């Protein structure tokens, strides 16, 4: 829909008329609409309940011989928006950056060298088409700044963009470390002299997760079989984007490997938590408890 060839069909009524005109019999039809947010007007964005496109999609889904797939930019249409619009009749298909196994099947060569390349530039598919390191770095940095960050700022009307930027840097530089909104807020105040509430930090963390830049693993009490509300570990959805954000500095091998393994487990549809076990130790007659 981002191609001007299809500009006419950004009008929801025209789109509906065009698609229905192609459904001429009882055969199965598969409809794929990419960048579907172009069919949503600015006025409709202000009043999501009036988005005409959702009615068009729901109408098509009622047809027994139609299977419809839509994708959209994060800033205009997140997964939860689509699922809400489909009123329980839609399914989410999670597509991750390519795994190391997929990367190696395309890259080939020495496996150790391939892993070093993957640990540096990650698994965004277009990275493989870039001819040299400079092009790869530039692509990932532009993708982070011009696509992901702009999506977040446009969708959520960020009132403190500087805080969002500092928060993102903090998460990227400490992947795999336990943290929470209060801790981050205190760090920003003491190190950067930025006063911000933990509530704002918590809200921004959710924005980063909803926009698929990060995901988090909650702490789970293995013995008590319960989740701790905080702290959690945060991981970048793609390690190449993490490195690009940090200008390819801070190449901490163990943290990067942990992030890659975490992403691999998600790709294999595992639910990943941070296990916590409480241990009681006795020293000089005194009993102490610690978590590990």
Give the location of each predicted region:
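Catalytic P-loop NTPase motifs of RecA-like helicase/translocase cores
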Residues: 4-7, 37-42, 77-78
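Short, glycine/charged-enriched secondary-structure capping and boundary segments
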Residues: 13-15, 45-49, 53, 83-88, ...
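The start of beta-strands in P-loop NTPase/AAA+ ATPase cores
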Residues: 29-30, 233
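Conserved Walker B catalytic segment
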Residues: 32, 36-69
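Accessory nucleic acid-recognition modules appended to NTPase machines
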Residues: 133-291
């Amino acid at each position: 829909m981002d191609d001007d060839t299809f500009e006419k069909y950004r009008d929801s009524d025209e789109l509906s008329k065009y698609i229905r005109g192609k459904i001429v019999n009882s055969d199965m039809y598969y409809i794929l609409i990419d960048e579907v947010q172009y069919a949503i007007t600015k006025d409709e964005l202000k009043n999501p309940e009036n988005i005409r496109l959702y009615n068009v999609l729901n109408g098509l889904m009622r047809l027994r011989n139609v299977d419809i797939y839509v994708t959209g930019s994060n800033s205009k249409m997140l997964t939860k928006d689509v699922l809400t619009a489909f009123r329980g009749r839609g399914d989410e298909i999670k597509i991750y950056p390519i795994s190391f196994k997929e990367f190696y099947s395309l890259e080939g060569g020495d496996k150790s060298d391939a892993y070093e390349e993957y640990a540096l530039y990650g698994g965004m598919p277009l990275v493989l088409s870039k001819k040299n390191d400079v092009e790869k770095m530039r692509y990932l940095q532009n993708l982070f700044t011009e696509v992901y960050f702009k999506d977040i700022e446009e969708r959520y009307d960020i009132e403190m963009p500087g805080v969002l930027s500092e928060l993102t840097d903090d998460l990227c530089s400490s992947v795999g470390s336990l943290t929470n909104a209060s801790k981050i807020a205190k760090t920003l105040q003491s190190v950067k002299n930025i006063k911000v509430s933990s509530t704002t930090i918590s809200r921004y963390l959710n924005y980063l997760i909803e926009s698929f830049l990060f995901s988090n693993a909650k702490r789970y009490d293995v013995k008590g079989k319960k989740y701790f509300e905080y702290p959690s570990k945060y991981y970048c959805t793609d390690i190449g984007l993490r490195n690009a954000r940090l200008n390819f500095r801070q190449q901490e091998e163990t943290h990067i490997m942990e992030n890659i393994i975490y992403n691999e487990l998600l790709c294999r549809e595992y639910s990943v938590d941070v296990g916590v076990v409480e241990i009681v130790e006795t020293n000089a007659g005194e009993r102490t408890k610690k978590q590990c």
